[in-house]
Amino acid sequence: MKTIGILTSGGDAPGMNAAIRAVVRTGIYYGLKVKGIMRGYAGLVEDEVIDLNLSSVGDILQKGGTILRTARCEEFKKKEVRKKAYETLQKHGIEGLVVIGGDGSFRGAQLLSEEWNVNTIGIPGTIDNDIPCTDYTIGFDTACNTVIDAINKIRDTATSHERANIIEVMGRNAGYIALYAGLAGGAEMIILPEVEWSIDELCDKITYGIKRGKLHHIIVLAEGVMSAPELAKMIKERLPKLDLRYTILGHIQRGGAPTVMDRVLASQMGARAVELLLENKTKRIISIRNNQIVDDDIDEALSMKKEFNRKLYELSKILSI
């Protein structure tokens, strides 16, 4: 193998640049040429390929986002479009492709491997932490720290004004950001897709807190359950005198300098991706499980089901009495 390519696909996540850096520097260390594909699969289809060298990845370790940029590519579901992507790989002599992204990105890599025998390696990069085969994804820790910073600041003003605050965080189908940030931020209630909840239980908890002299109430809501305005309306219907505000954190969760954990994880995964290609292993997704870097067959990895950490959720309820 002489030349490898790398792309970032789907939603961006802090730490993607650290992974790109690791792939490029490890590849060069082993004597490989490294090509960058701009704008994910869309750029692969449209032949947006650049050369990457040591200078290309200098001073990016600490930066959020992705220097290769990213884009959605619905057209990639069509085989004739994927053929164009394969032709781009052939044109540039790319023998192995590293894909950084989430579930949809890996399914694209899976199809390239199945249809055109492309050597592919997946690196999980998404703030949602919803990839079944790995304990943590690149970007998750940074996103949680961003949310915690917001919770801390909102609590300051909530205490001053004796208010309740709803903080809506990302997570359409997975509530890991809500769970981890809610637990670490001391939320009175965490509302997420994986667990049933009761509006009456929430309002009873707020009422009890007021009676015992509590000055603030923090409710962390995953966006996939409902919107913050909808939840606020439900609460106000039951507690009309409650001073209630809501904050939708939105895309602030995707930006910012990656944490130490995300930088280290991305560096490990990026380096391992190159090593797997040099070992002639393909159709693999790299993961971290039990603090060890491992890899799985892409078909098996995509068929896994992520087990929700019920113990952490129960702990959050115990600690929020």
From Swiss-Prot:
It is found in: Cytoplasm. GO terms for cellular component: 6-phosphofructokinase complex. Allosterically activated by ADP and other diphosphonucleosides, and allosterically inhibited by phosphoenolpyruvate. The active site is at D128. InterPro entries: ATP_PFK (IPR022953), ATP_PFK_prok-type (IPR012003), PFKA_ATP_prok (IPR012828), Phosphofructokinase_CS (IPR015912), Phosphofructokinase_dom (IPR000023), PKF_sf (IPR035966). Keywords: Allosteric enzyme, ATP-binding, Cytoplasm, Glycolysis, Kinase, Magnesium, Metal-binding, Nucleotide-binding, Transferase. It catalyses: beta-D-fructose 6-phosphate + ATP = beta-D-fructose 1,6-bisphosphate + ADP + H(+). It holds the Pfam family PFK. It comes from the Bacteria. Its EC number is 2.7.1.11. Mg(2+) binds at D103. Pathway: Carbohydrate degradation; glycolysis; D-glyceraldehyde 3-phosphate and glycerone phosphate from D-glucose: step 3/4. Substrate binds at T126, I127, D128, R163, M170, G171, R172, E223, R245, H251, I252, Q253, R254. Its cofactor is Mg(2+). ATP binds at G11, R72, C73, G102, D103, G104, S105. One of its GO terms (molecular function) is identical protein binding. ADP binds at R21, A22, V23, V24, R25, R155, G186, A187, E188, R212, K214, L215, H216. One of its GO terms (biological process) is fructose 1,6-bisphosphate metabolic process. Catalyzes the phosphorylation of D-fructose 6-phosphate to fructose 1,6-bisphosphate by ATP, the first committing step of glycolysis. Homotetramer. Belongs to the phosphofructokinase type A (PFKA) family. ATP-dependent PFK group I subfamily. Prokaryotic clade 'B1' sub-subfamily. This is ATP-dependent 6-phosphofructokinase. It comes from Thermoanaerobacter pseudethanolicus (strain ATCC 33223 / 39E) (Clostridium thermohydrosulfuricum). The gene is pfkA.
